[in-house]
Structure formats: structure tokens, C-alpha cells
Amino acid sequence: MLHNITLSLVPEIITDNILIKAKEIAQFLNIPLSDRREEYPQALIWDRDGLSLCSISAKDGSHAKLLYIDFMGGKNGYRHANDCTTRQPIAKAVGIKPGFRPTVFDATAGMGGDGFVLACLGCRVTLCERSPIMYTLLQDGIERARQDSVMNKIMANLDLIHNNSKQFLENHGTNYHTIYMDPMYPHKKKSALNKKEMRVIRDLVGDDNDSDNLLETALTVAGNRVVVKRPKGAPYIEERKPHHEITMKNSRFDVYLTSYL
């Protein structure tokens, strides 16, 4: 797990309001607010682009971005512009139909990419993230996107909560038509998770070793289905065979129906 992190502000963005918010973030994460970032191996740096998790050089305090959530540019921006159609596999997996958009609980929000795609397609999505740092980065990315007049309409479909998904579902799971899971799976050589961004996420949140318990809870409360994203060729969670699978190049969706509409 990542540790020994500070929150650092770029001087030119500092205002009274930003300083108040920065103190609230530091308190929530239980990390120091410091202008001596070179004393830490990692830092949440707040600059004109927003919040990003960075590695810090002990030699000169320079930084390299590790994680940054951007719903308007990069991969998410590309998907919004090019891939957001109901023909894509995730739309079929969660139960999107002509004239019908399911309510979706994303139990493993991560970088928020899949939840964002579903929001683009008109689904009401609740993103749940238990890692405080991932939650903070997500919150910052969502807030920045909401400042754009076009993106604000899409982001209105997204709700973000910081919680343990299993515990939340035990109390509120019946509110959702579809429960979506994309658990971190054990590391394998040559896995797509060897990409730097995903390695950092793994270090930050660890493997989802409780995914079997989460699936069990989800199956008892989902209104229509539970969708589990898995690497292609990976075993089913707890060897529980789904009702059907949607296979892609490197991954698949295991679809477990809890009722038939």
C-alpha cells in the first residue's frame, strides 16, 4: 500500500477558499499539508489541472504524475467522443435496452471509467470507492467535469460515495437494477495490469480479496443482474458460473441474472 504521502499546493493557485478545501482534504486523508514535498516519496499535488498523485524526487522535489482522473480528456474523453454507443459490450452487459436505462451501482469505482461510460449512455450510476485517496481523486475529477456545460449534463448521472460496497449494498442494494463489479485480480506476468497506472492502483488499494463475499451480497439484492468484469480466461469468482458471458479481446463480462424482465 502507498503510505507516507503529503498534500502539496502549487503556490500560484493558492487562495483562501482553496486553502480551506486543502485542509479539509488533508484532514479526511489524515495526511500532512506541506510545501516540502521533497521530504515525501509520494504527494497529492494540487495545481491548475487539479489533484494528481505523484512520485517525488528526493533530490530536487520534482514530480511525475502517477494517477490523474480526467473525464474531459485522455482515455475517458476519447471514449465519450467515439465509443459511447449502446452497441458496446458493457451496454449489453448491464441491461441497456431501447427506451430503458438501468440504475447501476458500480461497486469497484477505481478510476471511474466504466461508470462514466454508463453515465454517458444515460444510466444513473452510483460510484462506490473505499480507498480514501482514489475517492478524493475521483471527487476532484467529477467536480472539474461539472464545470463544463456539456459535461455537467453527463455528470448529473453520477453519484460518488466513499464506503465499503458490501456494507452499503446490505442496506441499500435493492435500489439498483444492476450491480457492476470490476475487482482487482491477483497479479500475473504479462497482464494488462502491468501498465504503470494500474500498478499504482494495485499498490494503493490492493487486490479485492473479498470479491467472493461482495458477489454473494450483490446477488441477494440486485434488482435484475450482477455483472462481473474478468480477465479473459480467468476463473469465475468462487467457481460460480454466470447465466451468460460477453467476451471481448482481453476481458469478459460474467452476467448473473437475479430476475427476468
Curated annotation (Swiss-Prot):
Entry similarity comment: Belongs to the methyltransferase superfamily. RsmJ family.
Molecular-function GO term, any one: rRNA (guanine-N2-)-methyltransferase activity
HAMAP family: 16SrRNA_methyltr_J
Protein localization: Cytoplasm
Residues that, per the record, bind S-adenosyl-L-methionine: 129-130, 182
Function field: Specifically methylates the guanosine in position 1516 of 16S rRNA.
Keyword Transferase: yes
Organism: Desulfotalea psychrophila (strain LSv54 / DSM 12343)
Catalysed reaction, written as an equation: guanosine(1516) in 16S rRNA + S-adenosyl-L-methionine = N(2)-methylguanosine(1516) in 16S rRNA + S-adenosyl-L-homocysteine + H(+)
Keyword Methyltransferase: yes
EC number(s) recorded for this UniProt protein: 2.1.1.242
InterPro entries reported in the protein's UniProt record: 16SrRNA_methylTrfase_J, SAM-dependent_MTases_sf
Keyword terms of this UniProt record: Cytoplasm, Methyltransferase, rRNA processing, S-adenosyl-L-methionine, Transferase
Listed GO CC annotations: cytoplasm
Main location: cytoplasm
Full protein name: Ribosomal RNA small subunit methyltransferase J
Source domain of life: Bacteria
